[in-house]
Amino acid sequence: MSNIYIQEPPTNGKVLLKTTAGDIDIELWSKEAPKACRNFIQLCLEAYYDNTIFHRVVPGFIVQGGDPTGTGTGGESIYGVPFKDEFHSRLRFNRRGLVAMANAGPHDNGSQFFFTLGRADELNNKHTIFGKVTGDTVYNMLRLTEVDIDDEERPRNSHKIRSCEVLFNPFDDIIPREIKKPKKEKPEEEVKKLKPKGTKNFSLLSFGEEAEEEEEEVNRVSQSMKGKSKSSHDLLKDDPHLSSVPAVESERGDAAEDSDDDGEYEGAEHDEYVDGDEKNQMRERIAKKLKKDTSENVKRAGEGEVEKKPVSRSEELRKEARQLKRELLAAKQKKAENSAIQAEKRSEEEEAAPDGAVAEYRREKQKYEALRKQQAKTGTSREDQTLALLNQFKSKLTQAIAETPENDISETEVEDDEGWMSHVLQFEDKSRKVKDASMQDSDTFEIYDPRNPVNKRRREESKKLMREKKERR
């Protein structure tokens, strides 16, 4: 990978694309591809790429964008006409993250560009490389491919460029133009929706006058009833067979109140059907029934409150706390009774037990239990007690060493509790005594050294004897 950076020329210019997939940093080769870089920077300054989509995605190959129409056929350069290709021997499609101009043929560069997603040797000397994606933003570039794609390599939910920011402009003479973006072509469905509604020509119909009158009446009624709910009474006000008097009298207090409030309206509307006496009788019946119902409801509510007093949550918690206290107290009493029974049993056993080893064992046990009860369980008191015991042991040890007797101590004293402190460790002297080499003993080993002069003489003498024997034979 290092040889790639050595081969590629240094960059001069930087642009930041803010996309829906994240920010993408692009460094430009403005010396190697000046026309393409000038075109790209000026379009960014003019906000030409803002809200444009990446209309083509080929996984593992390229991601293409820069077309304001979003179709893949639009977009133009700052020069007004397509500009020429700019190839360089040190710029090759040998890795991902390169930025190049998209074109439909030689010298046909406009506003569209693409990112490479891998090695693409087939694009060399066909498309102008003018920049590269740098840093960790290359991963945001790869996120542009994480979309569903149709058969025509178009993403269904495409990412888009939100805005562009020129971080370093190598061309000081660029003056942004004030241009309008070409609008996207609207689909056929939207065009159909925007078509104006046709006007009705009633003169063509044989019953045109009647139809026109009905149309006007319907429009007038719909305007008057706009925003209101409609019922059969609203639509059929003039029907004499419909009456506003309910067939079944309401038993609820709210309905009775509504009937009292609307009494004047009902009386004014139905004077034709109901006389004044009948109206008074009806009102009296309704008032009596209303009083009766309200008294019964109050009575029932009072009985319900007496019978069912709602128990609050706090009252329940108090009851539970009292119950737990009772249980804990009972458990403590039971434990105390058990301990008393056990103590009685122990005392009975001690009285019944004979003197001897068992009695001595029990005395020792009681002694250590008493010591254990005296010990503090936790805290500074336990620590102080431990240090006091340690100091006591040290003083006892130093005293025993100082008072060590010169004479040997018998084994009975050594086995005593404090006798081992003053005991001196002594070993039996088992060193071997020196023996005389000339004295033969059962433990004496024969040492033979061939370099010894005595042994040499013996060997020579034995050799002479052997020669003489051979000569005699």
Curated annotation (Swiss-Prot):
Residues 178-193, 231-241, 267-348, 360-372, 426-438, 458-473 have a biased composition (Basic and acidic residues). It comes from Bos taurus. One of its GO terms (cellular component) is catalytic step 2 spliceosome. CDD domains: CWC27_CTD (cd22288), cyclophilin_CeCYP16-like (cd01925). PROSITE patterns: CSA_PPIASE_1, CSA_PPIASE_2. Part of the activated spliceosome B/catalytic step 1 spliceosome, one of the forms of the spliceosome which has a well-formed active site but still cannot catalyze the branching reaction and is composed at least of 52 proteins, the U2, U5 and U6 snRNAs and the pre-mRNA. Recruited during early steps of activated spliceosome B maturation, it is probably one of the first proteins released from this complex as he matures to the spliceosome C complex. Component of the minor spliceosome, which splices U12-type introns. It is found in: Nucleus. SUPFAM superfamilies: Cyclophilin-like. One of its GO terms (biological process) is protein folding. The gene is CWC27. This is Spliceosome-associated protein CWC27 homolog.
